[in-house]
Amino acid sequence: MIKRTVKNIAEMVKGTLANPQYEQTVIHGVATDTRKLEQHQLFIPLKGERFDGHSFVEQAFEAGVAAVLWDRSVPNPPENHAVILVDDTLTALQQLAKAYLQELGTRVIGVTGSNGKTTTKDMIHAVLGTQYRVHKTGGNFNNHIGLPLTVLAMPENTEIAVLEMGMSAKGEIDLLSRLANPDAAVITNIGESHMQDLGSREGIAEAKLEIINGLKEDGVLIYIGDEPLLQNAYSCQTKTYGTGTHNDYQLQDVSQSEEGTHFTIKGIENTFFIPILGKHNVMNAMAAIAAGAYFGIAPEDAAKGLSGLKVTGMRLELIKTDSGLSIINDAYNASPTSMKAAIQLTESLEGYGKKMLVLGDMLELGDLEETFHKECGAVISPDKIDRVFTYGKLGAFIAEGALKHFEKDRVSHYTEKKDLLQAVKENASKGDLILFKASRGMKLEEIVKDLIESPLS
């Protein structure tokens, strides 16, 4: 983590030390949340819609922080403490992270995309970790606050930082890219997430491509070459991956089992293995292999790193319960692209009793939300899936789409989670496989937790 004197911090954020007697005070790390404070940290009070962190500065000092930033427009900065006056505390947080990166000379990989950012970040970390000291975004700390905090938590001996870059509107990736100044930028895909804010997939592609704006002059853009919206000639160096013959990394063979997925790439002798399911995760792994190659990681080392992959939870997580159920917990988030991929994956797996889907609302899809939900229901094969359970206001449209092919008694919709849980329990038996997939706000993991902890009906 960052360790600097208050004088150093003031210089890095272009601020003014309110009381020079504290200039040699040393801070150890940064925090913006008083609920997570540690002694000797720098507390940065941020202004939100419902609160102003400046109101908690005295509490922060009582908790043992060494210093705070203070917005000049806020009256009455605390006396007899190390206080750095700045024009805007959020901007100062971002400036501090940028300056810290520049001081250390750490190389950076930025990762964005509609789906798969976190998994791809984890995979790149696994590949690069075979040869380098690597720091990565924790969880999905990927916005204008989370990314700077990730950087400032980075050990000083970090050689490469893998930074996830999320967005909900145009301009956000631009800010993050210019802050991080990446050596390599990865775009995992262009989906439908944030359609509500960006209007179209074309708008989403434009927003994701902002990651190029901060790319170093000799940097590389790594992206899925099968995506028509990413077919332009880019001024930077590029590497592509996918199934098409035009890609630099072309997928050859894929095979799946409960243990994970094996795959090969044309022109590379190694067979790669990832301990997670899904062809879309193979694409994410190929992005990691390409990123690793850019930093000099040989295919055999990339294969070793990927085989030991540890991914962030609730992303196609295969769980075996004591009751004999197999559960695919993919409840962290959902978009039409990722939901269809999860459905297809479940359909492809063999050796189970019944195969069932529990699908809920996909949020932030804008005017096309009804259409997207119906499409997801319509792709489900009645020959490969035994039962479909849907949940939520928009989940009803998934059920409507599924009923184009399914008998009515094989598709059920629920508006109450307790009723959904009861129905799943009544229909599930030892040896069955159940997929859970919905947007984060639907909290389907609550049902997964109940199925793990309690016996079937």
Swiss-Prot record:
<dbReference type="GO" id="GO:0008360">
    <property type="term" value="P:regulation of cell shape"/>
</dbReference>
<dbReference type="InterPro" id="IPR035911">
    <property type="entry name" value="MurE/MurF_N"/>
</dbReference>
<comment type="pathway">
    <text>Cell wall biogenesis; peptidoglycan biosynthesis.</text>
</comment>
<dbReference type="GO" id="GO:0047480">
    <property type="term" value="F:UDP-N-acetylmuramoyl-tripeptide-D-alanyl-D-alanine ligase activity"/>
</dbReference>
<dbReference type="InterPro" id="IPR004101">
    <property type="entry name" value="Mur_ligase_C"/>
</dbReference>
<keyword id="KW-0133">Cell shape</keyword>
<comment type="similarity">
    <text>Belongs to the MurCDEF family. MurF subfamily.</text>
</comment>
<dbReference type="InterPro" id="IPR000713">
    <property type="entry name" value="Mur_ligase_N"/>
</dbReference>
<dbReference type="Pfam" id="PF01225">
    <property type="entry name" value="Mur_ligase"/>
</dbReference>
<dbReference type="GO" id="GO:0009252">
    <property type="term" value="P:peptidoglycan biosynthetic process"/>
</dbReference>
<keyword id="KW-0963">Cytoplasm</keyword>
<dbReference type="GO" id="GO:0005737">
    <property type="term" value="C:cytoplasm"/>
</dbReference>
<keyword id="KW-0547">Nucleotide-binding</keyword>
<keyword id="KW-0132">Cell division</keyword>
<dbReference type="InterPro" id="IPR005863">
    <property type="entry name" value="UDP-N-AcMur_synth"/>
</dbReference>
<feature type="binding site">
    <location>
        <begin position="113"/>
        <end position="119"/>
    </location>
    <ligand>
        <name>ATP</name>
    </ligand>
</feature>
<dbReference type="Pfam" id="PF08245">
    <property type="entry name" value="Mur_ligase_M"/>
</dbReference>
<keyword id="KW-0436">Ligase</keyword>
<dbReference type="GO" id="GO:0005524">
    <property type="term" value="F:ATP binding"/>
</dbReference>
<dbReference type="GO" id="GO:0051301">
    <property type="term" value="P:cell division"/>
</dbReference>
<protein>
    <recommendedName>
        <fullName>UDP-N-acetylmuramoyl-tripeptide--D-alanyl-D-alanine ligase</fullName>
        <ecNumber>6.3.2.10</ecNumber>
    </recommendedName>
</protein>
<dbReference type="InterPro" id="IPR036615">
    <property type="entry name" value="Mur_ligase_C_dom_sf"/>
</dbReference>
<keyword id="KW-0961">Cell wall biogenesis/degradation</keyword>
<dbReference type="InterPro" id="IPR013221">
    <property type="entry name" value="Mur_ligase_cen"/>
</dbReference>
<dbReference type="Pfam" id="PF02875">
    <property type="entry name" value="Mur_ligase_C"/>
</dbReference>
<keyword id="KW-0067">ATP-binding</keyword>
<dbReference type="GO" id="GO:0008766">
    <property type="term" value="F:UDP-N-acetylmuramoylalanyl-D-glutamyl-2,6-diaminopimelate-D-alanyl-D-alanine ligase activity"/>
</dbReference>
<dbReference type="InterPro" id="IPR051046">
    <property type="entry name" value="MurCDEF_CellWall_CoF430Synth"/>
</dbReference>
<keyword id="KW-0573">Peptidoglycan synthesis</keyword>
<dbReference type="InterPro" id="IPR036565">
    <property type="entry name" value="Mur-like_cat_sf"/>
</dbReference>
<dbReference type="GO" id="GO:0071555">
    <property type="term" value="P:cell wall organization"/>
</dbReference>
<keyword id="KW-0131">Cell cycle</keyword>
<comment type="function">
    <text>Involved in cell wall formation. Catalyzes the final step in the synthesis of UDP-N-acetylmuramoyl-pentapeptide, the precursor of murein.</text>
</comment>
